[in-house]
Amino acid sequence: MSVRATISDSKSDFHKEFPYVIPAIYRKLADELLVELHLLSHQKNFKKDSIFSTGLKEVFSKFTSGYKPSEHATKLFDAICNCNGFNPTEINNSSEQLVSNAKSFTKEDLNSFLSKTNNDNKGYDYYSRINAIGIYKLVSEMPLFKEVKEEDLNKEINDISKSLGYQYSRVEKDISMYKSNIEKMKQALEIIALNLKTK
């Protein structure tokens, strides 16, 4: 019988694959994602699908904006995934495919995609906040919703959440927190850039 990996095991594997210093501003993100993926790897009713993959890529890319050296960002993502048994190449490919498809999705295409996702995920109903970000990224890429009012966009997110069996209140809260944290990260990076210029 295989021994269940602990969070200490995951962190040890992570540092072996990524033996670099993580800049302080990005450290919290790396730690939170590492812990979250570790917990998800032990959830029997969790399934990694294209919405989750898209959410994970979106969170990582937004919160590692300006990472130096830039080539370390890719290594960081790979290490966070690998140390928890997630395949970074599969996640990248799955995310890229969905984002590419979403750019030409009609309402019918969206409904068909959601129906297929539901069928594929039967028995796997564990919700992660990363799924919420995947939903947000999905609708953000669809031309159908580019010019709509925020209330209409929220209604669509509500409909998608319900169709996937997620509580909209949780999805809405996670998206709202995500957007707020992005803004804080932007401001922090601007302050750092300003301080570097004045030195």
From Swiss-Prot:
InterPro entries: Thf1 (IPR017499)
Keywords, alphabetical: Coiled coil
GO biological process: photosystem II assembly
Segments forming a coiled coil: 167-198
GO cellular component terms attached to this protein's record: plasma membrane-derived thylakoid photosystem II
Nucleus recorded as keyword: no
Domain of life the protein comes from: Bacteria
NCBIfam families xref list: PS_II_psb29
Family in the record: Belongs to the THF1 family.
Cited function: May be involved in photosynthetic membrane biogenesis.
Name under which the protein is recorded: Protein Thf1
Classification of source organism: Bacteria, Bacillati, Cyanobacteriota, Cyanophyceae, Synechococcales
